[in-house]
Amino acid sequence: MQVYNKNIGYTLLRSLWVNPIISLSLRRLVVRGKENLPKDGAVIIGSNHTNALLDPLVILRSMNRATIFMTRADIFRRPLLQKVFTFLKMLPIYRIRDGYAAVKQNEEIIRKCVDVLRHRYPLALFPEATHRPKHSLMGLSKGIFHIALEANKQFGHEKPVYIVPTGIEYGRYFRYRSNAVVTYGKPINVTEFVRQHEGEVTPARLLAMLREELARRMSELIAFVPDTEAYDARWELTKLCTAQSPPLSPAERITLNRAAIARIVEKTDSDPEAAQALYADALAFKKERRLRRIHPSSTGHKHPLIASIGNTVAL
Protein backbone atom coordinates (compact mmCIF):
# COMPACT_ATOMS: atom_id res chain seq x y z
CA MET A 1 0.00 0.00 0.00
CA GLN A 2 1.38 3.39 -1.03
CA VAL A 3 1.19 6.10 1.61
CA TYR A 4 -0.65 8.39 -0.80
CA ASN A 5 -3.35 5.89 -1.80
CA LYS A 6 -6.88 7.13 -1.16
CA ASN A 7 -8.41 5.48 1.90
CA ILE A 8 -11.94 6.07 3.16
CA GLY A 9 -10.86 4.91 6.62
CA TYR A 10 -8.20 7.63 6.79
CA THR A 11 -10.67 10.26 5.57
CA LEU A 12 -13.19 9.30 8.25
CA LEU A 13 -10.52 9.15 10.94
CA ARG A 14 -9.22 12.57 9.96
CA SER A 15 -12.66 14.14 10.29
CA LEU A 16 -13.57 12.24 13.48
CA TRP A 17 -10.18 12.61 15.20
CA VAL A 18 -8.40 15.77 14.08
CA ASN A 19 -11.30 18.21 14.34
CA PRO A 20 -12.37 17.16 17.87
CA ILE A 21 -8.78 17.22 19.19
CA ILE A 22 -8.23 20.72 17.79
CA SER A 23 -11.57 21.91 19.18
CA LEU A 24 -10.78 20.47 22.61
CA SER A 25 -7.16 21.62 22.72
CA LEU A 26 -7.46 25.12 21.28
CA ARG A 27 -9.83 27.97 21.97
CA ARG A 28 -9.24 29.39 18.52
CA LEU A 29 -7.24 28.42 15.44
CA VAL A 30 -6.42 31.21 13.01
CA VAL A 31 -5.17 30.31 9.53
CA ARG A 32 -3.41 32.94 7.45
CA GLY A 33 -1.88 32.86 3.98
CA LYS A 34 -3.70 29.89 2.46
CA GLU A 35 -3.65 31.84 -0.80
CA ASN A 36 0.13 31.24 -0.77
CA LEU A 37 -0.31 27.48 -1.20
CA PRO A 38 0.55 26.82 -4.87
CA LYS A 39 -1.91 24.96 -7.07
CA ASP A 40 0.33 24.46 -10.10
CA GLY A 41 3.04 22.21 -8.70
CA ALA A 42 4.48 20.02 -5.96
CA VAL A 43 4.08 21.48 -2.46
CA ILE A 44 6.41 20.88 0.51
CA ILE A 45 5.41 22.47 3.82
CA GLY A 46 8.36 23.54 5.98
CA SER A 47 7.22 24.54 9.47
CA ASN A 48 8.71 25.42 12.83
CA HIS A 49 8.10 22.80 15.53
CA THR A 50 7.04 23.64 19.08
CA ASN A 51 4.50 20.94 19.97
CA ALA A 52 4.98 17.28 19.02
CA LEU A 53 1.25 16.44 18.90
CA LEU A 54 -0.54 19.65 18.00
CA ASP A 55 1.75 20.97 15.25
CA PRO A 56 0.88 18.21 12.73
CA LEU A 57 -2.81 18.41 13.64
CA VAL A 58 -2.87 22.19 13.24
CA ILE A 59 -1.36 21.85 9.76
CA LEU A 60 -3.69 19.00 8.85
CA ARG A 61 -6.73 20.98 9.99
CA SER A 62 -5.63 24.13 8.18
CA MET A 63 -4.77 22.28 4.96
CA ASN A 64 -8.12 20.48 5.07
CA ARG A 65 -6.88 17.68 2.82
CA ALA A 66 -4.78 14.55 3.02
CA THR A 67 -1.19 15.55 3.78
CA ILE A 68 1.82 13.25 4.08
CA PHE A 69 3.98 13.91 7.15
CA MET A 70 7.59 13.02 7.81
CA THR A 71 8.32 11.84 11.34
CA ARG A 72 11.20 10.34 13.27
CA ALA A 73 12.06 6.83 12.17
CA ASP A 74 12.40 5.14 15.57
CA ILE A 75 8.60 4.89 15.98
CA PHE A 76 8.43 2.75 12.82
CA ARG A 77 10.60 -0.08 14.16
CA ARG A 78 7.77 -2.49 14.93
CA PRO A 79 6.01 -3.91 11.83
CA LEU A 80 2.53 -3.33 13.27
CA LEU A 81 3.30 0.31 14.07
CA GLN A 82 4.80 0.73 10.62
CA LYS A 83 1.45 -0.30 9.10
CA VAL A 84 -0.45 2.01 11.43
CA PHE A 85 1.71 5.04 10.61
CA THR A 86 1.59 4.30 6.89
CA PHE A 87 -2.21 4.21 7.18
CA LEU A 88 -2.00 7.63 8.88
CA LYS A 89 0.02 8.87 5.87
CA MET A 90 3.32 9.22 7.66
CA LEU A 91 6.81 8.40 6.40
CA PRO A 92 9.94 7.85 8.51
CA ILE A 93 12.98 10.05 8.28
CA TYR A 94 16.29 8.98 9.80
CA ARG A 95 18.46 11.39 11.76
CA ILE A 96 22.16 11.38 12.62
CA ARG A 97 21.30 10.20 16.13
CA ASP A 98 19.85 7.02 14.56
CA GLY A 99 23.32 6.06 13.30
CA TYR A 100 25.11 6.35 9.97
CA ALA A 101 23.74 3.05 8.64
CA ALA A 102 20.20 4.18 9.37
CA VAL A 103 20.72 7.56 7.72
CA LYS A 104 21.71 5.81 4.50
CA GLN A 105 18.14 4.49 4.33
CA ASN A 106 16.98 8.04 3.69
CA GLU A 107 17.83 7.55 0.02
CA GLU A 108 14.85 5.21 -0.26
CA ILE A 109 12.72 7.58 1.84
CA ILE A 110 13.58 10.48 -0.48
CA ARG A 111 12.49 8.34 -3.43
CA LYS A 112 9.13 7.75 -1.72
CA CYS A 113 8.76 11.45 -0.95
CA VAL A 114 9.39 12.36 -4.58
CA ASP A 115 6.73 9.83 -5.57
CA VAL A 116 4.29 11.48 -3.14
CA LEU A 117 4.97 14.89 -4.67
CA ARG A 118 4.68 13.51 -8.19
CA HIS A 119 1.14 12.40 -7.31
CA ARG A 120 0.31 15.97 -6.16
CA TYR A 121 0.02 15.25 -2.45
CA PRO A 122 1.47 17.92 -0.15
CA LEU A 123 4.40 16.77 1.98
CA ALA A 124 4.89 18.33 5.43
CA LEU A 125 8.19 18.42 7.33
CA PHE A 126 9.52 20.05 10.47
CA PRO A 127 13.09 20.81 9.33
CA GLU A 128 14.31 21.66 12.84
CA ALA A 129 14.16 17.85 13.35
CA THR A 130 12.96 18.18 16.95
CA HIS A 131 10.47 20.25 18.91
CA ARG A 132 10.79 22.70 21.77
CA PRO A 133 8.46 25.39 23.20
CA LYS A 134 10.39 28.45 22.06
CA HIS A 135 9.68 31.44 19.84
CA SER A 136 12.82 30.79 17.85
CA LEU A 137 14.35 28.45 15.30
CA MET A 138 17.10 25.87 15.51
CA GLY A 139 19.31 25.06 12.54
CA LEU A 140 17.36 23.47 9.70
CA SER A 141 18.27 19.92 8.71
CA LYS A 142 19.10 19.16 5.08
CA GLY A 143 16.38 16.56 4.46
CA ILE A 144 13.70 18.95 3.19
CA PHE A 145 16.13 20.43 0.66
CA HIS A 146 17.39 17.05 -0.56
CA ILE A 147 13.75 16.07 -1.20
CA ALA A 148 12.93 19.32 -2.99
CA LEU A 149 16.05 19.23 -5.16
CA GLU A 150 15.58 15.57 -6.08
CA ALA A 151 11.91 16.20 -6.96
CA ASN A 152 12.95 19.13 -9.11
CA LYS A 153 15.59 17.01 -10.81
CA GLN A 154 13.04 14.31 -11.66
CA PHE A 155 10.02 16.33 -12.75
CA GLY A 156 10.81 20.04 -12.41
CA HIS A 157 10.64 20.35 -16.20
CA GLU A 158 6.97 19.27 -16.03
CA LYS A 159 5.76 21.21 -12.99
CA PRO A 160 7.46 23.45 -10.44
CA VAL A 161 8.48 22.32 -6.96
CA TYR A 162 7.71 24.65 -4.06
CA ILE A 163 8.72 24.88 -0.40
CA VAL A 164 6.12 26.82 1.58
CA PRO A 165 7.58 28.45 4.73
CA THR A 166 5.12 27.97 7.58
CA GLY A 167 4.94 29.44 11.07
CA ILE A 168 2.94 28.07 14.00
CA GLU A 169 2.43 30.27 17.06
CA TYR A 170 0.58 29.38 20.27
CA GLY A 171 -0.70 32.01 22.67
CA ARG A 172 0.72 30.07 25.61
CA TYR A 173 2.61 26.83 25.25
CA PHE A 174 1.50 25.27 28.52
CA ARG A 175 -2.05 26.55 28.79
CA TYR A 176 -5.01 24.35 27.95
CA ARG A 177 -7.21 25.82 25.18
CA SER A 178 -4.85 28.58 24.18
CA ASN A 179 -5.02 30.22 20.76
CA ALA A 180 -2.97 29.13 17.76
CA VAL A 181 -2.03 30.85 14.52
CA VAL A 182 -0.68 29.01 11.48
CA THR A 183 0.72 31.23 8.74
CA TYR A 184 1.66 30.06 5.25
CA GLY A 185 4.24 32.40 3.76
CA LYS A 186 5.18 33.18 0.18
CA PRO A 187 6.46 29.94 -1.39
CA ILE A 188 10.01 29.38 -2.52
CA ASN A 189 9.90 28.26 -6.15
CA VAL A 190 12.70 25.70 -5.99
CA THR A 191 12.55 25.08 -9.74
CA GLU A 192 13.11 28.77 -10.47
CA PHE A 193 15.70 29.03 -7.68
CA VAL A 194 17.75 26.22 -9.24
CA ARG A 195 17.39 27.71 -12.71
CA GLN A 196 18.72 31.06 -11.51
CA HIS A 197 21.76 29.69 -9.69
CA GLU A 198 22.62 26.46 -11.54
CA GLY A 199 26.14 26.58 -12.91
CA GLU A 200 27.05 29.56 -10.73
CA VAL A 201 27.42 27.71 -7.43
CA THR A 202 28.21 24.18 -6.27
CA PRO A 203 25.35 21.82 -5.31
CA ALA A 204 26.38 22.16 -1.65
CA ARG A 205 26.24 25.95 -1.85
CA LEU A 206 22.88 25.81 -3.64
CA LEU A 207 21.45 23.73 -0.79
CA ALA A 208 22.93 26.13 1.77
CA MET A 209 21.33 29.08 -0.02
CA LEU A 210 17.94 27.37 0.03
CA ARG A 211 18.45 26.64 3.70
CA GLU A 212 19.21 30.28 4.49
CA GLU A 213 16.20 31.47 2.49
CA LEU A 214 13.75 29.11 4.18
CA ALA A 215 15.07 29.94 7.66
CA ARG A 216 14.73 33.67 6.95
CA ARG A 217 11.18 33.32 5.68
CA MET A 218 10.11 31.05 8.54
CA SER A 219 11.49 33.50 11.10
CA GLU A 220 9.29 36.25 9.62
CA LEU A 221 6.12 34.26 10.33
CA ILE A 222 6.54 33.87 14.10
CA ALA A 223 7.39 36.07 17.09
CA PHE A 224 11.03 35.32 16.43
CA VAL A 225 13.68 35.76 19.13
CA PRO A 226 17.22 34.90 17.94
CA ASP A 227 18.39 31.59 19.39
CA THR A 228 21.22 32.89 21.56
CA GLU A 229 22.10 32.80 25.26
CA ALA A 230 20.01 35.96 25.64
CA TYR A 231 16.82 34.22 24.48
CA ASP A 232 15.17 33.79 27.91
CA ALA A 233 15.88 37.37 28.97
CA ARG A 234 14.73 38.83 25.67
CA TRP A 235 11.47 36.87 25.70
CA GLU A 236 10.80 37.91 29.31
CA LEU A 237 11.35 41.53 28.31
CA THR A 238 9.00 41.08 25.37
CA LYS A 239 6.23 39.75 27.62
CA LEU A 240 6.70 42.58 30.10
CA CYS A 241 6.78 45.30 27.47
CA THR A 242 3.56 44.08 25.82
CA ALA A 243 1.72 43.08 29.00
CA GLN A 244 -0.41 46.22 29.18
CA SER A 245 -1.55 46.22 25.56
CA PRO A 246 -5.30 46.24 24.87
CA PRO A 247 -7.05 42.98 23.91
CA LEU A 248 -5.67 41.79 20.58
CA SER A 249 -6.42 39.03 18.12
CA PRO A 250 -3.87 36.18 18.02
CA ALA A 251 -2.46 37.51 14.74
CA GLU A 252 -2.19 41.06 16.12
CA ARG A 253 -0.38 39.69 19.16
CA ILE A 254 2.32 38.21 16.90
CA THR A 255 2.78 41.59 15.19
CA LEU A 256 3.05 43.37 18.55
CA ASN A 257 5.56 40.84 19.88
CA ARG A 258 7.68 41.08 16.73
CA ALA A 259 7.83 44.87 17.05
CA ALA A 260 8.83 44.63 20.71
CA ILE A 261 11.50 42.02 19.98
CA ALA A 262 12.98 44.16 17.20
CA ARG A 263 13.27 47.13 19.55
CA ILE A 264 14.77 45.05 22.34
CA VAL A 265 17.36 43.48 20.04
CA GLU A 266 18.27 46.85 18.51
CA LYS A 267 18.54 48.54 21.90
CA THR A 268 20.58 45.81 23.55
CA ASP A 269 22.86 45.23 20.56
CA SER A 270 23.78 48.92 20.53
CA ASP A 271 25.04 48.78 24.14
CA PRO A 272 26.22 45.25 25.04
CA GLU A 273 27.43 46.24 28.51
CA ALA A 274 24.09 47.76 29.50
CA ALA A 275 22.35 44.81 27.87
CA GLN A 276 23.99 42.35 30.25
CA ALA A 277 22.71 44.28 33.26
CA LEU A 278 19.25 44.49 31.71
CA TYR A 279 19.23 40.75 30.98
CA ALA A 280 20.25 40.01 34.56
CA ASP A 281 17.39 42.18 35.86
CA ALA A 282 14.93 40.49 33.52
CA LEU A 283 15.97 36.99 34.58
CA ALA A 284 15.92 37.93 38.27
CA PHE A 285 12.44 39.34 37.84
CA LYS A 286 11.33 36.22 35.96
CA LYS A 287 12.56 34.01 38.80
CA GLU A 288 10.72 36.07 41.42
CA ARG A 289 7.60 36.31 39.28
CA ARG A 290 7.42 32.56 38.82
CA LEU A 291 7.99 31.93 42.52
CA ARG A 292 4.99 34.14 43.23
CA ARG A 293 2.99 32.54 40.38
CA ILE A 294 2.42 35.85 38.64
CA HIS A 295 1.75 35.90 34.90
CA PRO A 296 3.31 38.76 32.90
CA SER A 297 -0.13 39.99 31.87
CA SER A 298 -0.85 40.69 35.55
CA THR A 299 2.12 43.01 35.93
CA GLY A 300 2.09 46.79 35.67
CA HIS A 301 4.72 49.47 35.15
CA LYS A 302 4.09 50.82 38.65
CA HIS A 303 6.51 48.21 39.93
CA PRO A 304 9.94 49.95 40.08
CA LEU A 305 11.83 47.09 38.43
CA ILE A 306 9.34 46.82 35.58
CA ALA A 307 9.36 50.59 35.18
CA SER A 308 13.15 50.53 35.00
CA ILE A 309 13.12 47.78 32.38
CA GLY A 310 10.42 49.52 30.36
CA ASN A 311 12.25 52.84 30.41
CA THR A 312 15.56 51.24 29.47
CA VAL A 313 14.09 49.48 26.46
CA ALA A 314 12.15 52.68 25.63
CA LEU A 315 8.97 50.99 24.52
Give residue ranges: language-model regions:
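Catalytic core of membrane glycerolipid acyltransferases/transacylases, capturing the structured
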Residues: 2, 7-15, 23, 37-102
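Non-catalytic C-terminal accessory region of glycerolipid acyltransferases
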Residues: 3, 97, 102-305
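Hydrophobic alpha-helical segments of integral membrane proteins
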Residues: 12-21, 84, 144, 210, ...
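Short gly/ser/thr-rich secondary-structure transition/capping motifs
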Residues: 24-31
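Residue-level signal for beta-strand positions within conserved beta-sheet cores that form or flank
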Residues: 27, 65, 86, 159, ...
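Structural motif corresponding to alpha-helix initiation and N-cap regions
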Residues: 31, 78, 107-110
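A secondary-structure boundary/capping signal
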Residues: 33, 71-72, 89, 126-127, ...
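Alpha-helical bilayer-embedded segments of polytopic membrane proteins, i.e.
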Residues: 306-315
